[in-house]
Each structure stands twice: as structure tokens, then as C-alpha cells.
């Protein structure tokens, strides 16, 4: 959430071609990641962009946005810290951007049901099987759990955003030294990104090398197959 807020702020405050290039690359990568939801653009890239059809999934293109958004966010931080008159020029943009992000977090926290609690394919499969009608209480419980997860994540984002905005505000009005503000912002950013990344890649995602070696030791049947070197030994 902090990277996103700083990215939006950078789109407003930063001048020059670098901003437009990063913004354009971000938008294009997001549009391309929609795949069949924007099929004309996907077909255009497949037909005319070399090697684009080698992607295993269209979502892989989001790696561009994962690079451009943090880069523009860091450029925004850099200008905030080095330009002495940044606050005078862009205080309204700072208030507006942070306020809008806070309002979005609050809205999601209080109204998690405003967003779909099931994916399109998930809903179609459950509806076709008639499971919504057969087990209404079960799906009510599932929806309640998903709402609580959405609300908890919105609250988490809200707290990180308030903490980072508070540090930056204190720095911009001269109440906190730039070095301390930079260190505090880096720690908050690390905590924000690390806790999200750990959901997808944690300690349970890794195994010791010795376990992997043991898993691939040749079995007697493997040795028997390898012993047959004829060209037509496989069916």
C-alpha cells in the first residue's frame, strides 16, 4: 500500500519524460495481464510482438509493473527528501493522495462485501452444481471468513499507511531529520512488503538439499529402463 500511495503521488508531483514512461509501462503491463478480458490487446501482442506467445501465463507481464511502480515511488521519496521547497509546492497533493488511500482502506474495512467474494469460475461451478442451494449455511460461513480476511487486510494497510504518512509528514515540516525519516520509511516499507511476501513464500516452501537428493535416487525400475539403449525401447 505504501508503494502504491507513493507511486500515485509521484504521478502527480514528478515532472519529465521518466514519469510518463514508467506510468505508460505500468498501465500497459496491467492491461496485458487481463488476458482474455482484453483479448484484442492480447492477440495484438501475440501476433506482432516476438516471443510474446512463449509466456506460460499472461500474469507474468506484471513483473514490469512490479518494477516500474516501486521505481517511481522511490523517485518520489528522493524528491521529497532532497528538495527543500517540496512541501510548499506539493502539500495538497500529499494530503490528497494519502487521504484518498486512507479512505479506500476505510471503505474496504467497513464494507468488505462491496467486492466479489468468489471468482467468476468459482461462482459458475458452484452454481452449476447447485451447491449454493444445498449448503447455504456452509457458504454463509465461507463468506463471513472471507469478509473478515478482507477487513483485516484493509486495517493492516491502513496502519502501515498512517505510519509512513506520519513519518513523511514529520520530515517535510521539519520535525524529523531526513536520515531518520529515510530509515523509518525503509523499515516500514520492509515490514509491509515482507509480511505480504511471506504469505506466498515462507520457510515451509523450502526443503533441505539432502531431502531433494534422496527423492531423485534411481530406483531399480529406472536402472532397468536406462540399461535398454535401443532406439525404439520406449512405447
Question: Language-model features: where?
Answer:
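Conserved luminal/periplasmic juxtamembrane motif of membrane-embedded glycan-processing enzymes
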Residues: 1-235
Amino acid at each position: 500500500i505504501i508503494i502504491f500511495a507513493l507511486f500515485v503521488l509521484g504521478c502527480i508531483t514528478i515532472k519529465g519524460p521518466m514519469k510518463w514512461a514508467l506510468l505508460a509501462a505500468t498501465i500497459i503491463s496491467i492491461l496485458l495481464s487481463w488476458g482474455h478480458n482484453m483479448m484484442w490487446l492480447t492477440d495484438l501482442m501475440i501476433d506482432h510482438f516476438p516471443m510474446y506467445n512463449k509466456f506460460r501465463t499472461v500474469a507474468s507481464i506484471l513483473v514490469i509493473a512490479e518494477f516500474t511502480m516501486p521505481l517511481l515511488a522511490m523517485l518520489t521519496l528522493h524528491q521529497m527528501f532532497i528538495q527543500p521547497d517540496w512541501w510548499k509546492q506539493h502539500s495538497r497533493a500529499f494530503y490528497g493522495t494519502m487521504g484518498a488511500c486512507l479512505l479506500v482502506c476505510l471503505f474496504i474495512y467497513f464494507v468488505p462485501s462491496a467486492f466479489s467474494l468468489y471468482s467468476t469460475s468459482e461462482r459458475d461451478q458452484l452454481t452449476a452444481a447447485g451447491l449454493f442451494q444445498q449448503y447455504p449455511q456452509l457458504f454463509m460461513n465461507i463468506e463471513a471468513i472471507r469478509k473478515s480476511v478482507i477487513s483485516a487486510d484493509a486495517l493492516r494497510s491502513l496502519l502501515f499507511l498512517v505510519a509512513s504518512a506520519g513519518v513523511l509528514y514529520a520530515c517535510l515540516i521539519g520535525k524529523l531529520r531526513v536520515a531518520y525519516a529515510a530509515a523509518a520509511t525503509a523499515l516500514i516499507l520492509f515490514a509491509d512488503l515482507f509480511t505480504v511476501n511471506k504469505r506466498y513464500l515462507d520457510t515451509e516452501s523450502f526443503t533441505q538439499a539432502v531431502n531433494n537428493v534422496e527423492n531423485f535416487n534411481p530406483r531399480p525400475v529406472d536402472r532397468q529402463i536406462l540399461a535398454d539403449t535401443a532406439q525404439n525401447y520406449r512405447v
